[in-house]
Amino acid sequence: MSCVHNNTSFPVQIEAYLKEVFEKYKELQESKDTSLTARFARALKYYQFLIYTAFSDPKFGIGQGENTRGLLIYHQMGMGKTILSLSLAISLSHIYNPILIAPKSLHSNFQQSLLKLIKLLYPETTDPSKELQKISRRFRFVSLDAYNMGQQIIKAGGSLNGCLLIVDEAHNLFRGIINSANDKTNARQLYNNIMQAKNIRILFLTGTPCSKDPFEMVPCFNMLSGRILLPLHYERFYTAYVNKTTNSPLNADKLLNRLVGMISYAGNQNELNKLFPTELPLIIEKVEMSPEQYRQYLLARDVENAEKHASSGMHEKINTAALCLPGSEQESGSSYYVRSRMISIFASEMLTIKEDEKLSEAVQQLPKEAFTETSSPKIVCMLKNIKTSPGPVLIYSQFVELGLHVVARFLEIEGYQCLQPLKVLEEGHNAILLHKDGKDLMVKNFAEDEPTHTLVLSSKITRFTLITGKILSKERDMIQQLWNSPLNIHGEVIKILLVSKTGAEGLDLKYGRQVHILEPYWDKAREDQVKARIIRIGSHDALPPEEKTVQPFLYIAVANQKMFYSIPEGSQEQKTIDERFHERGLEKSHLNSAFRDLLKRAAIECAFNGESGCLMCQPTNALLFHENFERDLRLPNPCQPLVKTEVKAYSISYEGKQFFYQKNKGVGLGYTFYEYNPIIKAYIEIKPSNPLYIKLIKHVQAGTTV
């Protein structure tokens, strides 16, 4: 069986196929079959096995032949996208060369996930690490954030021809492409290489597609289809598919037709949601700046406004280059607001930096007097909330030196101890540095050594640690293992983990009870990414039901009211930068969320999962879309809604096959005929244009039934 995605019959064909795969999955779950397929059925969740089978089945066609070249794996964060991609890499490695592209900090995540998968596949093995080495030799790793990514790809396989390309955190690639001013960037070079590659299979892994702008869909689906499926220019894309008046999708039906067959979505199913901890409603703490803090904030805003006016002419012309966002969109991530946003977190005149002194050193020397409700009301408010947490706590800030490091210094002053992984130990050790009775103690093999457990837990010190982009992957893994230790269920080992954007990516954490986001961002998907570090499938299984909850907090700095009303009317900024970022984020989130809903409706599992609004057409075998998107918009929609009804009809046999018919004077030549379609396991109407139609009429009129 094979099916082509640009066909009205594809949606019903894929639904029927997945139903068959699911029945096979249930059988293999209970069997003692030792084949590789059976082992994967027992190792994978059902939603993973559906995609594993559809993608690896040489007869079906997902990602091969006349079909597209791969899938956007849009699975809710924490549902095992890495395990799914590694399963396909193992199964297809004899045909395609697996190349895994991810930020450098996440490479070890793949190794850990691969070891986990090997243990699931081969529970009888006594040495999974040996099998890990054997399988790992088939894979090539490339750093998405490396300056020489192109050279790494050449070294990994010479080219992308004949490879299985797996891109983790793929939304970063999509953003990188549309933020590129030219073809010289890593992201744009990778896009061009993928578009030119032959015999390539692709898996884009992300839990947050369309997080910055719907235009991210363009490079994504052009690469998956291997052709210009969506318009390259921002203005053309928005004219075709975005209603700017209502801030919602336009021509959604035509866009769905083009996307079907390239998306896998998992995340809304009730049975899956039961496996996640409960995310409690977001608590937004609007923290009024102190008079001194607000004074510094206003000075910073004056400087930022002056810089903005000085460069105002630089972005007036709309950037119409292919695969580029207009210049006005690039402003959101600019440096214009960095000063004021950092002051919104911490403002102390005690933070003075000499020419020969690094900022981090200056932060480390801050005295207790520097941390008051005058200098850091946000941090003071956050710590009050943290003290109410019954378990581990995650803190996020975009800013490292004047965000996370300032918080870390405040925690030290408050009596918390910084837990630091040691860099000099042999690979495989879980080592920490802790302070007890005035001495520094090196603790090795934490995960295995019982006396070490006693030593750590008896110290009765509340610990915190940091993961930023500068930390080594081995140290990062060590911290994650310590956090996820059964001994850390209530934060006994690590109570607080501070993470940056880069540091947070790929973390898989258990037991977390609170998430604190220190400043809003105009991209709400980033906040979702942070929360998803501890809101994951099975992350709270070890906790009793009443403790399987996560409370998120967001901190927004607002104006000092007394000073605000003392400013002459007309000179006031009605909203702080924090407030503007938050509101902008909600506005953008509305549009991006609407496009993500379209992706869910076009997902190959949509109808199988019983979701509403799925793209389901009458299987007429007509083309689902015209290759030219502008002409496609002018043509009638070939996808006529599929309506399943029961009709009363007569049975006849013709040339050994059974057909049904109705006498209907208002249709065709007075008859409606139906034939059985084994792919969708239902009867479909035979069109009058089909030569079989006339033969069946003659057959009926002749009065024969054989």
From Swiss-Prot:
InterPro entries: Helicase_ATP-bd, Helicase_C-like, P-loop_NTPase, SNF2-like_sf, SNF2_N. Keywords: ATP-binding, Helicase, Hydrolase, Nucleotide-binding, Transcription, Transcription regulation, Transcription termination, Virion. ATP binds at residues 75-82. Induction: Expressed in the late phase of the viral replicative cycle. SUPFAM superfamilies: P-loop containing nucleoside triphosphate hydrolases. Residues 378-599 form the Helicase C-terminal domain. Residues 62-227 form the Helicase ATP-binding domain. Signal peptide: none annotated. GO terms for molecular function: ATP binding; hydrolase activity; RNA helicase activity. It holds the Pfam family Helicase_C. The keyword Hydrolase applies. Its EC number is 3.6.4.-. GO terms for cellular component: virion component. A motif (DEAH box) lies at residues 168-171. It is found in: Virion. GO terms for biological process: DNA repair; DNA-templated transcription termination; replication fork processing. The keyword ATP-binding applies. Belongs to the DEAD box helicase family. DEAH subfamily. Part of the viral DNA-directed RNA polymerase that consists of 8 polII-like subunits (RPB1, RPB2, RPB3, RPB5, RPB6, RPB7, RPB9, RPB10), a capping enzyme and a termination factor. Putative DNA-dependent ATPase required for providing the needed energy to achieve the termination of early transcripts. This is Termination factor NPH-I homolog. It comes from African swine fever virus (isolate Pig/Kenya/KEN-50/1950) (ASFV).
